Amino acid sequence: MNKVGILLILFILSLILPFTALYLAGDTHLITVKDIINFLLKGTTGNEFKDIIIKDVRLPPIIGAVLIGLTISVAGLMLQTLFRNLLASPYTTGISSGVLMVVALVIFIDSLSHLFEIFGEKSILVAGWCGGIFSMILLIIIALRVREANGVIIVALLLSYFFMGLRAYLIANAEELKIQEYWGFTIGSLSKITLGDVIPMTICSIIFIIGVMFLIKSLNALLFGEQYAKSFGLDIKKTRLLVLFFASFITGAIIPYVGLIAFIGIIAPYLARPLIKTSDHRYLVPATMFLGVILMVSCHILSLKYYLPIHYLYGINRPASPLPIGAVLDILGGMLVVYLVYKGEKKIKID
């Protein structure tokens, strides 16, 4: 099958799955397929209670999953192309670490907690945005000071470990309730997304996708190496800064809403390359987007339908608890990549 045919199939799947998730994400006897169709076409099911469940409980997490799949996966692809490293992602380049660091400071340090109290329930969200801006500025400074792309990722990774150490110090001296609050942010969950959150997330996603479209030609030039790209007149420094800016921008905009969902930025590009059998970003970017949506929505369904048997694992009398989507994605994605590498069927290269 040619590349366009594969993209069409992925596109159709990425459209069908969110609608399927709307039906499966809860009691299927309470809300039927007909209710879902009526709500999507008419804006109401004819039942106020069902409307509230769909609008406030089921719909926001699914839209969040779609937006994360569309954006964070492509942010990972851009960083992998820039650094010519399949492990490059918003997490491994330190972008997520900056967000987590600022959130940790706000949660664990009382003076900062009081300062952010003016934002009420959105204090952690605002802290995450500040962390995103901090990460963006830090990465741009590194990119301006370090000439080689590999040097940038090494410095960013070292800073990521530095932030990890600081967070460990803060956690070691923190109260249990604050540790639980921070842990709840880091594991990655779509459950806290509200319909009001969807609007800024969508706006940021649109800005990011438009930016990526303008960078496709430059990303293709980088496939042949920076020296080769320079010979074709590509401004390497400008391209590097733009890639880092957009990757930091979307990570800082999305992560505060959902916590740490990092692996999608590695696994979606990894699976897209052998599937469409090309490194041309004209095809690779949409393939990564569609795969990102498929993976995120599928993991969202699994996280709601399957529960972790806490009482069997730890021998304690507690009800089974839903799996956070970040854990589902990491477990299934990790096993899939290990299987593909072990079988030797997917020999992936950047160029």
Curated annotation (Swiss-Prot):
GO MF terms, alphabetically ordered: transmembrane transporter activity
Membrane-protein topology: Multi-pass membrane protein
Entry keyword annotation includes Kinase: no
Compartment annotation: Cell membrane
Keyword line: Cell membrane, Membrane, Transmembrane, Transmembrane helix, Transport
Keyword Repeat: no
Transmembrane segments: 4-24, 59-79, 99-119, 124-144, 152-172, 196-216, 249-269, 284-304, 322-342
Gene Ontology terms describing biological process: siderophore-dependent iron import into cell
Major place of residence: membrane
Cellular component, GO, one term: plasma membrane
Similarity annotation: Belongs to the binding-protein-dependent transport system permease family. FecCD subfamily.
Protein task: Probably part of a binding-protein-dependent transport system. Probably responsible for the translocation of the substrate across the membrane.
Name listed for the protein in its UniProt record: Putative ABC transporter permease protein MJ0876
Annotated source species: Methanocaldococcus jannaschii (strain ATCC 43067 / DSM 2661 / JAL-1 / JCM 10045 / NBRC 100440)
